Amino acid sequence: MNNKALVVIDLQNDITKNYKEIIETTNQAIDWAAANNMNVVYIRHHNLSAGTRTFKPDTRGAEFVPELKIVSDHIFTKTKSNALTSEEFAAFVSAHNITEFFIAGADATACIKSTCYNMTKDGYAVHVLSDCITSYDKKKLPEMLEYYASKGCTVDKLSEIM
Protein backbone atom coordinates (compact mmCIF):
# COMPACT_ATOMS: atom_id res chain seq x y z
CA MET A 1 0.00 0.00 0.00
CA ASN A 2 1.09 3.55 -0.60
CA ASN A 3 0.70 6.57 1.69
CA LYS A 4 -2.74 7.51 0.30
CA ALA A 5 -6.21 6.57 1.46
CA LEU A 6 -9.73 6.89 0.18
CA VAL A 7 -11.93 7.58 3.20
CA VAL A 8 -15.65 6.84 2.81
CA ILE A 9 -17.53 8.59 5.59
CA ASP A 10 -20.91 7.67 7.10
CA LEU A 11 -22.67 6.05 4.14
CA GLN A 12 -25.01 4.31 6.55
CA ASN A 13 -28.71 3.50 6.43
CA ASP A 14 -29.63 6.45 8.67
CA ILE A 15 -27.90 8.94 6.35
CA THR A 16 -29.78 11.11 3.88
CA LYS A 17 -31.49 9.37 0.99
CA ASN A 18 -29.42 11.69 -1.23
CA TYR A 19 -26.62 9.13 -0.98
CA LYS A 20 -28.26 7.28 -3.88
CA GLU A 21 -27.08 10.08 -6.17
CA ILE A 22 -23.42 9.48 -5.29
CA ILE A 23 -23.23 5.74 -4.63
CA GLU A 24 -22.25 4.75 -8.17
CA THR A 25 -19.46 7.32 -8.34
CA THR A 26 -18.35 6.44 -4.81
CA ASN A 27 -18.10 2.76 -5.77
CA GLN A 28 -16.06 3.81 -8.83
CA ALA A 29 -13.75 5.74 -6.48
CA ILE A 30 -13.38 2.60 -4.36
CA ASP A 31 -12.42 0.57 -7.45
CA TRP A 32 -9.98 3.31 -8.53
CA ALA A 33 -8.34 3.48 -5.10
CA ALA A 34 -8.01 -0.31 -4.82
CA ALA A 35 -6.55 -0.54 -8.35
CA ASN A 36 -3.99 2.13 -7.42
CA ASN A 37 -2.81 0.34 -4.27
CA MET A 38 -4.41 2.90 -1.96
CA ASN A 39 -5.86 2.11 1.44
CA VAL A 40 -9.66 2.05 1.29
CA VAL A 41 -11.08 3.07 4.65
CA TYR A 42 -14.68 3.14 5.84
CA ILE A 43 -15.81 5.36 8.69
CA ARG A 44 -19.12 4.81 10.43
CA HIS A 45 -20.81 7.01 12.98
CA HIS A 46 -22.29 5.72 16.22
CA ASN A 47 -24.53 8.15 18.06
CA LEU A 48 -24.26 7.60 21.79
CA SER A 49 -26.51 10.53 22.80
CA ALA A 50 -29.55 9.37 24.74
CA GLY A 51 -31.99 11.78 23.10
CA THR A 52 -31.47 10.73 19.49
CA ARG A 53 -32.63 7.78 17.42
CA THR A 54 -30.24 7.72 14.45
CA PHE A 55 -26.90 5.93 14.04
CA LYS A 56 -27.45 3.86 17.17
CA PRO A 57 -24.95 0.99 17.58
CA ASP A 58 -26.25 -2.46 16.63
CA THR A 59 -29.19 -1.11 14.62
CA ARG A 60 -29.94 -1.32 10.91
CA GLY A 61 -29.54 2.47 10.74
CA ALA A 62 -25.90 2.23 11.78
CA GLU A 63 -25.06 -0.34 9.08
CA PHE A 64 -23.48 0.70 5.80
CA VAL A 65 -25.93 1.20 2.95
CA PRO A 66 -26.36 -2.06 1.02
CA GLU A 67 -25.13 -0.62 -2.28
CA LEU A 68 -21.73 0.40 -0.84
CA LYS A 69 -18.85 -1.71 -2.15
CA ILE A 70 -16.72 -2.99 0.73
CA VAL A 71 -13.22 -4.01 -0.42
CA SER A 72 -11.27 -3.92 2.85
CA ASP A 73 -11.67 -4.58 6.53
CA HIS A 74 -10.40 -1.08 7.36
CA ILE A 75 -13.65 -0.10 9.08
CA PHE A 76 -13.50 2.37 11.94
CA THR A 77 -16.17 3.78 14.23
CA LYS A 78 -16.37 7.37 15.42
CA THR A 79 -18.69 9.01 17.93
CA LYS A 80 -17.86 12.62 16.98
CA SER A 81 -17.95 14.45 13.66
CA ASN A 82 -14.19 14.37 13.01
CA ALA A 83 -13.04 10.93 11.81
CA LEU A 84 -9.61 11.51 13.36
CA THR A 85 -11.25 11.36 16.82
CA SER A 86 -11.51 7.61 16.30
CA GLU A 87 -8.40 6.38 18.09
CA GLU A 88 -8.33 3.26 15.94
CA PHE A 89 -8.47 5.29 12.71
CA ALA A 90 -5.80 7.71 13.94
CA ALA A 91 -3.57 4.74 14.84
CA PHE A 92 -4.17 3.20 11.39
CA VAL A 93 -3.18 6.48 9.71
CA SER A 94 0.01 6.63 11.75
CA ALA A 95 0.91 2.95 11.32
CA HIS A 96 0.48 3.16 7.53
CA ASN A 97 2.21 6.55 7.17
CA ILE A 98 -0.81 7.97 5.35
CA THR A 99 -0.27 11.59 4.36
CA GLU A 100 -2.84 12.09 1.61
CA PHE A 101 -6.58 11.55 1.76
CA PHE A 102 -9.39 11.38 -0.80
CA ILE A 103 -12.79 11.99 0.82
CA ALA A 104 -16.20 10.59 -0.11
CA GLY A 105 -19.51 10.20 1.75
CA ALA A 106 -21.80 12.33 3.89
CA ASP A 107 -22.71 14.71 5.36
CA ALA A 108 -20.91 17.54 3.56
CA THR A 109 -22.01 20.09 6.17
CA ALA A 110 -21.10 18.03 9.23
CA CYS A 111 -18.76 15.03 9.45
CA ILE A 112 -17.01 15.62 6.13
CA LYS A 113 -16.57 19.30 7.00
CA SER A 114 -15.09 18.53 10.41
CA THR A 115 -12.87 15.72 9.14
CA CYS A 116 -11.47 17.77 6.24
CA TYR A 117 -10.85 20.80 8.44
CA ASN A 118 -8.98 18.76 11.03
CA MET A 119 -6.99 16.78 8.47
CA THR A 120 -5.71 19.94 6.77
CA LYS A 121 -5.04 21.55 10.15
CA ASP A 122 -2.90 18.52 11.00
CA GLY A 123 -0.90 18.95 7.78
CA TYR A 124 -2.39 16.21 5.62
CA ALA A 125 -3.13 16.66 1.91
CA VAL A 126 -6.89 16.39 1.45
CA HIS A 127 -8.81 15.94 -1.80
CA VAL A 128 -12.59 16.23 -1.60
CA LEU A 129 -14.25 14.24 -4.39
CA SER A 130 -17.09 16.62 -5.21
CA ASP A 131 -19.14 14.01 -7.07
CA CYS A 132 -18.75 11.53 -4.19
CA ILE A 133 -20.16 13.67 -1.35
CA THR A 134 -23.69 14.68 -0.46
CA SER A 135 -25.75 16.37 2.22
CA TYR A 136 -29.19 16.48 3.76
CA ASP A 137 -29.30 20.02 2.34
CA LYS A 138 -27.95 19.76 -1.19
CA LYS A 139 -28.36 23.52 -1.67
CA LYS A 140 -25.38 23.96 0.65
CA LEU A 141 -23.01 21.82 -1.44
CA PRO A 142 -21.56 24.71 -3.52
CA GLU A 143 -20.91 26.68 -0.33
CA MET A 144 -19.25 23.64 1.25
CA LEU A 145 -16.99 23.08 -1.76
CA GLU A 146 -15.83 26.70 -1.40
CA TYR A 147 -15.29 26.13 2.31
CA TYR A 148 -13.13 23.06 1.70
CA ALA A 149 -10.98 24.97 -0.80
CA SER A 150 -10.63 27.90 1.63
CA LYS A 151 -9.29 25.50 4.27
CA GLY A 152 -6.61 24.06 1.98
CA CYS A 153 -8.36 21.07 0.44
CA THR A 154 -8.35 20.44 -3.27
CA VAL A 155 -11.79 19.84 -4.73
CA ASP A 156 -11.92 17.49 -7.70
CA LYS A 157 -14.38 15.33 -9.56
CA LEU A 158 -13.39 11.68 -9.61
CA SER A 159 -12.96 11.76 -13.39
CA GLU A 160 -10.38 14.56 -13.02
CA ILE A 161 -8.05 12.46 -10.90
CA MET A 162 -8.51 9.00 -12.40
PLM regions: where:
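Active-site-adjacent betaalpha module
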Residues: 1-5, 24, 28, 32-36, ...
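Short, conserved beta-strand edge motifs with alternating hydrophobic and charged residues
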Residues: 7-9, 40-44, 76-77
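Active-site loop/turn elements of alpha/beta-hydrolase fold enzymes
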Residues: 11, 45-47, 131
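Short acidic, Gly/Ser-rich segments with clustered Asp/Glu that frequently serve as metal-coordination loops
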Residues: 12-18
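Flexible, glycine-rich phosphate/dinucleotide-binding loops
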Residues: 15, 49, 135
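Flexible, glycine- and charge-enriched loops at secondary-structure boundaries
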Residues: 19, 23
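Von Willebrand factor
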Residues: 33-49
